[in-house]
Amino acid sequence: MRVLGIETSCDETGVAIYDSEAGLLGHTLYSQVAVHAEYGGVVPELASRDHVRKLLPLVDGLLDNTDSRNKIDAIAYTSGPGLIGALLVGACFGRGLAMAWGCPAIGVHHMEGHLLAPMLEDAPPAFPFVALLVSGGHTQLVEVQGIGKYVLLGESLDDAAGEAFDKAAKMMDLDYPGGPNIAKLATKGDVSRFKFPRPMTDRPGLDFSFSGLKTFTLNTVAKYADETGLPDDQTCADIACAFQEAVVDTLVIKCRRALQQTKLNTLVIAGGVSANVRLRERLEAALAKINSQVYYARPEFCTDNGAMIAYAGCQRLLAGQVEPLAINVSPRWALDTLPAI
């Protein structure tokens, strides 16, 4: 089965073609970073309009590059969670193509796509495992027994980790997107200068909270600010380093706790923040001490992309899942409500 995957949940337009026998044939990604940079964050209306402009030429080029014209068996598109306007662009486009081509179409859960992205690698993880889904909109620990067999172990009670990264970056006047810029600045910082809190690590449970850490960062920036309203460059780097270390520490502690609680020895990290080099280093070191392994997708598949949607959709279609013709999108959609296959 050859599946065209379409991702438009936020500010990236991703398309890909996955073949159940040959694997990933090709993928293309257009990022809207330049569109939203001047606003310091994603503007939903601009995101939707840009998806409309980019989808057709991206799909057209991909069909040619992969020799897939008239060879697509099904279409998978992100149907939630995400920005409703952006989701509708991809859903309408995908459903329209499916009707024109006379093939089935299926809506895919965005976070299931992220969770399954490491399956695209040469050495994928095997079920069961614990997944850390960590992005701008989600921070969740999930026990995964198979596709659709998900048990939520813990989640953020307020800000997601990626959202906290972006907000901390804004406090230091760093460009959008903030997460990668915080990580870059942190490499120049002194990790021993500031000690930031590790929220909710001193109590049982697997939930997260990053709002207090965000406030602590804001107060530290204000305390050391000069006449420009910001601390000097080195202090900003030290704050970025301390902030990143606090987030990474918190995630590592909770991941170890989740593995011990479930008695599993495999961890998958997925979502945009999983591309963070420091997080990967710390998790690999921590899990090696307890004879556990960590898996993640290549960096280009950590952020939103069409490949993960094509793969996830293909697995559900092969299992016989079918959907009505109605176009349904869900801006909010709990992962553990998905049907098992």
From Swiss-Prot:
Superkingdom of origin: Bacteria
Keyword Transferase assigned: yes
Binding site for substrate: L133, V134, S135, G136, G137, D166, G179, N276
Subcellular location: Cytoplasm
Coiled-coil intervals: none
Keywords recorded for this protein, A-Z: Acyltransferase, Cytoplasm, Iron, Metal-binding, Transferase, tRNA processing
Pfam families: TsaD
InterPro entries reported for this sequence: ATPase_NBD, Gcp-like_dom, KAE1/TsaD, Peptidase_M22_CS, TsaD
Cofactor: Fe(2+)
Main location: cytoplasm
One cellular component (GO) term of this entry: cytoplasm
Catalytic activity: L-threonylcarbamoyladenylate + adenosine(37) in tRNA = N(6)-L-threonylcarbamoyladenosine(37) in tRNA + AMP + H(+)
GO biological process, one term: tRNA threonylcarbamoyladenosine modification
One Gene Ontology molecular-function label: N(6)-L-threonylcarbamoyladenine synthase activity
NCBIfam families, per the entry: gcp_kae1, T6A_TsaD_YgjD
Summary of the function given for this chain in its UniProt record: Required for the formation of a threonylcarbamoyl group on adenosine at position 37 (t(6)A37) in tRNAs that read codons beginning with adenine. Is involved in the transfer of the threonylcarbamoyl moiety of threonylcarbamoyl-AMP (TC-AMP) to the N6 group of A37, together with TsaE and TsaB. TsaD likely plays a direct catalytic role in this reaction.
Family label: Belongs to the KAE1 / TsaD family.
The name this protein goes by in its record: tRNA N6-adenosine threonylcarbamoyltransferase
Organism per entry: Saccharophagus degradans (strain 2-40 / ATCC 43961 / DSM 17024)
